UniProtKB/Swiss-Prot annotation:
Record-linked PROSITE patterns: WSC
Molecular function GO terms recorded: protein transmembrane transporter activity
Compositional bias annotation for Low complexity: 381-399
Entry-listed glycosylation sites: N340, N386, N389, N398, N479, N553, N583
Protein name: Cell wall integrity and stress response component 4
Lineage: Eukaryota, Fungi, Dikarya, Ascomycota, Saccharomycotina
Cytoplasm among keywords: no
Region of interest called Disordered, as start-end residue ranges on this chain: 151-305, 381-404, 494-521
UniProt feature, compositional bias: Polar residues: 497-521
Species the sequence originates in: Saccharomyces cerevisiae (strain ATCC 204508 / S288c) (Baker's yeast)
Signal peptide (from-to): 1-26
GO BP terms: cell wall organization; protein targeting to ER; protein targeting to membrane; response to heat
């Protein structure tokens, strides 16, 4: 009976809880003028808080205003009193659906957490994650480097202080392998690690790869000595001397050297300290690598992969605090081309690791520096420069000679342009001469014709006199007695009178002593038979004797014009002034002068 009553009460309590929770969820919790809806609004004629809440299932808020319903996942930044959203819902008059008159939206919270605790819950979660991450980082004190990092393993108890500002790790060495033509740099930082332990012995097995270098026509001896190895670094050198590598730390270096009658030995030495935990001793690391100054000129490299035997190492550490500032690995690739076979025959890979500022903070020791240089050559035939004095003998410097082209020689370029310029200048001069010669050809032909005419004319007129013919025009400064009258005046009697001389000098000089009215000399240069008849008036002239007594020294030039004086206005009155003017005929012209040649010359020009 009691059980049934208890079950009935529980049922009633559950029904009331469901009803109350539904009523609470369907009530406006925020009223705001902002609409932060993330979905499109839905219009419902029978809008109510319950219907909009069901429509926005899965969202944080259901927004109502009159007939509209929106869904949102964010709370508005500005809020007003919930009593302002007093608009009645169209579908259920007992509920409020915002306020359309005041443009207010009612927010119905659909989440399970109260509004006031949403932000605090998120903040608490972030803080928890942060603390968890810090715990993980602090607990991992053995290594924070990538998977290629090898750290010493100690059998003693290690205590590391928890510091949130930095991470703790034991001294580590990064081994990075890179292909040629790549450069990689690794930076590692660490904080002090406090370790207290006694002397212990650890046996470990590690695998390493050694390189055997065979030198042509020589004896190769390879010796590899390794001790206290937790981290292995391969160093290859080739010289006539014996390089020595010394180590004083839980870090060892395996060196393989191959030359003719040469052996390279690595002797790492680890420092020991008392086993008592109360004493502290600093530990420093020093790498010294001796490289030869000469190298063979031709070497054939052969690679052999071997597996080392198990290594037994003894580690002694006492309360050390070592800080590694930075570690740099530089990888340089050099490609060399052999000009004899015209192909790349060798590749050189050089790795240089520099570790600086290694000190012990317990005793305040002076900071020391350690430099470890690792070199490896990858490829086929190696050609070295025998005169190179470099620190690393495994990085030969090859000088490839390249043939210079035409454009790399300034002398060839200058000579070519000079020859081309001279040829172009000669061609231009020839063209100028041909153009000038062609343009002056008509004038030269006319001049030749005139010269020939004048020569024949005066030779036929004065055959017994000396005639001097000059085919060129003398310069005005020359000592020449030639003078050329500008105009030659003649009358009908054949008398020749000269006017003032012309500044131009004549190309023809004529000295006449015979009477100008000689029938034989007055003939045409082409011996025209008509001219003797025309000159008959000159033979019977009453003043013939007077003309015979006159000596004429007339110089005829190229531009000499024979003109009758009666045609010149300045000579018009000369006949009236002369005493024998009445004896001169003023009717006929000088028929003995052939004017046809002059006319033809003017027409041709």
């Amino acid at each position: 009976m009691q059980t049934s009553m208890v079950s009935a009460k529980v049922s009633i309590w559950l029904v009331c809880s469901v009803i109350c929770s539904s009523l609470v969820r369907a009530t406006q919790s925020v009223c705001s003028s902002q609409n932060t809806a993330t979905t499109d609004g839905v219009r419902n004629q029978f809008q109510s808080n319950g219907w909009c809440s069901n429509n926005c299932a899965g969202h944080q808020f259901a927004i109502v205003q009159g007939f509209m319903c929106w869904c949102s996942d964010s709370e508005p930044s500005t809020q007003t009193s919930v009593g302002d959203c007093s608009g009645t819902c169209p579908g259920y008059g007992y509920e409020d659906c915002g306020n359309a008159d005041k443009d207010l939206f009612g927010y119905i919270y659909l989440g399970q957490t109260p509004l006031s605790s949403v932000q605090s819950v998120e903040t608490s979660t972030e803080s928890s994650v942060y603390v968890s991450s810090s715990s993980i980082t602090s607990s991992s004190s053995t290594s924070i480097v990538d998977t290629t990092t090898i750290s010493p393993t100690l059998t003693s108890t290690s205590t590391t202080p928890l510091t949130t500002a930095s991470t703790s790790t034991t001294p580590s060495t990064d081994i990075t392998s890179a292909l040629p033509t790549t450069t990689s740099t690794k930076l590692s930082t660490s904080i002090p690690t406090s370790t207290t332990s006694s002397t212990s012995t650890t046996t470990s097995t590690s695998s390493s790869t050694s390189t055997t270098v065979s030198v042509t026509s020589s004896t190769s001896t390879t010796t590899s000595t390794t001790s206290s190895t937790l981290i292995s670094t391969s160093t290859s050198s080739s010289s006539s001397s014996t390089p020595t590598t010394t180590s004083s730390a839980p870090i060892s270096t395996s060196t393989t050297s191959s030359t003719s009658t040469s052996t390279s030995t690595t002797s790492p030495t680890s420092s020991s300290a008392p086993t008592s935990s109360s004493n502290t001793t600093p530990t420093s690391t020093t790498f010294t690598t001796t490289s030869p100054s000469t190298a063979p000129s031709s070497t054939t490299v052969t690679y052999t992969s071997t597996t080392a035997s198990p290594i037994t190492s003894t580690i002694t550490s006492v309360n050390l605090q070592t800080s590694l500032k930075y570690s740099v690995i530089t990888v340089t690739s050099v490609h060399t081309m052999d000009t004899n076979i015209s192909e790349i025959t060798s590749r050189y890979l050089t790795m240089k690791k520099v570790i600086t500022q290694i000190y012990s903070s317990t005793l305040g020791a002076t900071p020391t520096s350690a430099v470890a240089t690792t070199s490896a050559s990858v490829g086929g035939r190696i050609t070295n420069n025998n005169n190179s004095n470099t620190t690393n003998s495994n990085t030969p410097t090859n000088k490839s000679t390249e043939k210079k082209g035409y454009w790399d020689s300034p002398g060839k370029i200058a000579a070519t342009f000079v020859v081309v310029g001279v040829v172009c200048l000669v061609i231009i001069c020839i063209l100028i001469y041909l153009i000038h010669h062609y343009r002056t050809r008509p004038a030269r032909k006319a001049q030749d014709f005139e010269n020939e005419y004048q020569s024949k004319f005066y030779q036929s007129k004065y055959p017994n006199e000396v005639t001097t013919t000059t085919l060129h025009t003398p310069s005005p400064s020359s000592n020449s007695t030639f003078s050329t009258p500008r105009l030659i005046y003649t009358d009908e009697k054949g008398q020749i009178m000269s006017e003032s001389p012309s500044p131009r000098q004549s190309t023809y000089s004529l000295t006449a002593g015979s009477p100008p009215n000689d029938p034989s000399t007055l003939a045409s240069p082409f011996h025209d038979p008509i001219l003797p008849r025309r000159t008959s008036t000159f033979l019977h002239s009453p003043i013939q004797k007077q003309h015979e007594k006159m000596e004429s020294n007339v110089t005829l030039g190229e531009d000499t014009v024979l003109v009758d004086q009666r045609l010149d206005p300045s000579k018009m009155l000369n006949t009236l002034a002369n005493d024998d003017a009445t004896n001169h005929s003023t009717i006929s012209l000088s028929d003995n002068v052939d004017y046809s040649r002059r006319v033809l010359r003017l027409m041709n020009e």
